Amino acid sequence: MSDIISAVDAMEVLDSRGNPTVRVFVTLDNGTTCAASVPSGASTGENEAIELRDGDASRYLGKGVLKAVDNVKNIIAPAVIGKKITHQAAIDNLMIELDGTETKSSLGANAILGVSMAVARAGARSSRLPLYQYLGGPGARRIPVPAMNIINGGEHADNSVDIQEFMAVPVGAPSFGEGLRYIAETFHNLKKILKSRGLATSVGDEGGFAPNLESNEAAMDIIIEAIEASGYTPGKDIAFALDSAASSFSPDLCGSYDLKWSGGGKKDSADMIAMAQKWIEKYPIVSWEDPLAENDWAGFQKLTAAVGDKIDVVGDDLFVTNTKYIARGIEEKSANSVLIKLNQIGTVTESIDAVRMCREAGWRYFISHRSGETEDTFLADFAVAMDGGQLKTGSASRSERIAKYNRLLEIERELGANALYYW
């Protein structure tokens, strides 16, 4: 099969929030075309790669991406046409050079990532391999344990809960398919419980419920009820993962906090660490993402020293999938796990580099979607390719989330007895 890029095109499509995003098409000289669509985040770290928006208030409230589309067509395409499709790193590095900025603000990370993902997909097609094996090699066979978002708060919902995501993690399941069943059943039983108490069963951006609860702890209490109502044991069969997205309630993004949604009041780093320790003792928490704000490096270091032997302390906004910040975290022991988001850094190659750095340090890593997703299932293959064993891609509702789960079910079926699954 031919492996030379003959055309690159792009268009504006909508993500799961109804906002524009970029879809890129890469065509090989035998006529094969592969496409990829770029996700978008709501709670974003200040050091993330920049998605380019038009700022034209007359279109999509200023959120159009025609500039990014134009950059794909008129700047990136001429540079990559004629390149060998399997030279992923070379193509990604070429786009980084074309952009010339640290945060990809010139061409836009949404333009660059769209091309990077489409190139990877076309490379897999050209190599006659599934995407997960093309990116991860023939040994890629570990299906990630899903962390299903079942209660939303913070920036992802309009309610009285500060913590952005309360996730159910099927740590005791024997396979991905069974694990997905465990947490889907828990999701549906949670809906029944909420309904029986007159609480809202509307969902947030990632498909989790967004009820008005009296406290953050009330959210975990009701999830435990749902786990038990499903016939499972909290901690043994299903554990918790949390994402505080603490920068969203930190006025200075460093050591001060205001639990404004729940009315929990003002806190400092020491208060937040004490709260985390209390919750870890009380609830079956195995992973906690961004428990502190993105510039509270000292707080992260203290928290990791206190609880890092019990749970994964996951840096998201802290590291933004960037090896520069991950290296600092490893040096300072500011966490023990990294959230990997393709659009935080802007290329497939740099995302793989971030994973490689985690592996070399003995750190865990968690592959993640964004709150503004599309029907593209690239993330599912990428998670298997990276062999990290952990994935967050939303709830058991909203088809842009379900698409990733269904792709993982397909991969598990393809691998058969060779598939691995463990926390």
Swiss-Prot record:
(2R)-2-phosphoglycerate binds at Q164, K341, R370, S371, K392. SMART domains: Enolase_C (SM01192), Enolase_N (SM01193). It catalyses: (2R)-2-phosphoglycerate = phosphoenolpyruvate + H2O. Transmembrane segments: none annotated. SUPFAM superfamilies: Enolase C-terminal domain-like, Enolase N-terminal domain-like. One of its GO terms (molecular function) is magnesium ion binding. One of its GO terms (cellular component) is phosphopyruvate hydratase complex. Pathway: Carbohydrate degradation; glycolysis; pyruvate from D-glyceraldehyde 3-phosphate: step 4/5. Mg(2+) binds at D243, E289, D316. Its EC number is 4.2.1.11. One of its GO terms (biological process) is glycolytic process. The active site is at E206, K341. It is found in: Cytoplasm; Secreted; Cell surface. Disulfide bonds: none annotated. Binds a second Mg(2+) ion via substrate during catalysis. Keywords: Cytoplasm, Glycolysis, Lyase, Magnesium, Metal-binding, Secreted. Its cofactor is Mg(2+). Belongs to the enolase family. Catalyzes the reversible conversion of 2-phosphoglycerate (2-PG) into phosphoenolpyruvate (PEP). It is essential for the degradation of carbohydrates via glycolysis. This is Enolase. It comes from Desulfotalea psychrophila (strain LSv54 / DSM 12343).
